[in-house]
Amino acid sequence: MARVRVRQHVNPLSQKFQVVTTWPDWQQVYADCDRPLHLDIGCARGRFLLAMATAQPEWNYLGLEIREPLVDEANAIARERELTNLYYHFSNANLDLEPLLRSLPTGILQRVSIQFPDPWFKKRHQKRRVVQPELVQALATALPAGAEVFLQSDVLEVQAEMCEHFAAEPRFQRTCLDWLPENPLPVPTEREIAVQNKQLPVYRALFIRQPAD
């Protein structure tokens, strides 16, 4: 399959991305909808989830991506490999996350990852960053106790801001105040491999959803 070419940066606040998506019937998507679910927000070409779904078939995987051609390409590859625990959806996470979380069976979402999100360096563009207080609150409300949120970036400013947003939500507890020395997941992303091959740092943090008082 030829590699799909897309723009690297997509403005999630543009008018074309302000239509709330329709979520599928999850019982029709996954062979076993009772498995724990890993949600990857901003999955790009989906190669990370493709490897995870193969390595950990006891989990279901859902990738959200705002660039629709990448979603179509990733789902085609998943179908070719007959992976019934993997699905990708075209979505603007800042708009669609709450409806998505409401659509899922209660308690199945056990892990969320946000990896190397678009940094949007210019100050006037920072409101386009995916991790906003509203996203954190939505996850805190939906995730069961013990669920994990894994964050990583090669941009210190972006990683620090993401961690600040999650640390400000009392229902999340960071596992370690220092950056994690290694990725706790068994599969690296394509971006992670590229950064490490250049011997550049990757900043990682893990948050756990705390039990209700």
Curated annotation (Swiss-Prot):
What does the record give as the active site?
A: 118
Please name one Pfam family that this protein belongs to.
Methyltransf_4
Read off the CDD domains from this record: AdoMet_MTases
Give UniProt keywords alphabetically. Answer: Methyltransferase, S-adenosyl-L-methionine, Transferase, tRNA processing
Q: Which PROSITE patterns match?
A: SAM_MT_TRMB
Substrates-to-products reaction catalysed: guanosine(46) in tRNA + S-adenosyl-L-methionine = N(7)-methylguanosine(46) in tRNA + S-adenosyl-L-homocysteine
Q: From the record, give the cysteines joined by S-S bonds.
A: none
**Binding positions (substrate):** 122, 154
UniProt binding sites for S-adenosyl-L-methionine: 40, 65, 92, 118
Tell me which GO cellular component terms the UniProt record holds.
Answer: tRNA methyltransferase complex
User: From which domain of life does this come?
Assistant: Bacteria
EC number, as in UniProt = 2.1.1.33
Query: Which pathway does it operate in?
Result: tRNA modification; N(7)-methylguanine-tRNA biosynthesis
- Entry GO MF terms: tRNA (guanine(46)-N7)-methyltransferase activity
Name the family the entry cites. Belongs to the class I-like SAM-binding methyltransferase superfamily. TrmB family.
Task: Describe its function.
Answer: Catalyzes the formation of N(7)-methylguanine at position 46 (m7G46) in tRNA.
The record ties this protein, via HAMAP family, to: tRNA_methyltr_TrmB (MF_01057)
Q: What is this protein called?
A: tRNA (guanine-N(7)-)-methyltransferase
Which source organism?
A: Synechococcus elongatus (strain ATCC 33912 / PCC 7942 / FACHB-805)
Q: What is the lineage of its organism?
A: Bacteria, Bacillati, Cyanobacteriota, Cyanophyceae, Synechococcales
